[in-house]
């Protein structure tokens, strides 16, 4: 979300989650298609052959036989996480979320909130103005029809 939050505040720009969605699509279809088939399939969405190659390479990296279906699926988790954050943005304690390896589900555990240490927390630059950050998230959610 951090790469979108500043961009979301530029009035003429539209902070679409298309890259995350395209990565999700690529990851899903990597499990169904070979490298060549996925490359051809992505032609519908990505005109530039070099860019298309990079998308396929991203999900097929480390696979020894790219002629068979299979790939890395972590990009599916990224989009799902972004959507969850956008849907729950008004109830999330973002300071607690960035305080360590904490999931959105962990934030719902009362005992955790009691033991978290939020003093001396290193706040990332994009979150220093929480009002501005939330306004950016609101815009990202609106542009992507998430609410």
Label every model-predicted segment.
Residues 16-147:
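Conserved alpha-helical "signature site"
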Residues 1-10:
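An active-site-proximal "capping" alpha-helix that borders the catalytic cofactor pocket
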């Amino acid at each position: 979300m951090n790469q979108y939050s500043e961009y979301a505040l530029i009035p003429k720009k539209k902070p679409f989650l298309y890259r995350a969605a395209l990565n999700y699509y690529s990851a899903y279809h990597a499990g169904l298609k070979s490298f060549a088939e996925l490359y051809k399939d992505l032609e519908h969405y990505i005109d530039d052959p070099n860019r298309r190659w990079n998308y396929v390479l991203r999900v097929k990296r480390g696979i020894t036989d790219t002629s068979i279906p299979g790939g890395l699926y972590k990009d599916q988790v990224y989009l799902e996480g972004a959507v969850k954050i956008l849907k729950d943005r008004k109830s999330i304690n973002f300071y607690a979320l960035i305080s360590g390896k904490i999931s959105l589900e962990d934030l719902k555990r009362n005992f955790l909130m009691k033991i978290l240490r939020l003093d001396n927390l290193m706040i990332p630059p994009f979150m220093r103005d929480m009002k501005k950050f939330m306004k950016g998230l609101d815009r990202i959610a609106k542009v992507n029809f998430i609410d």
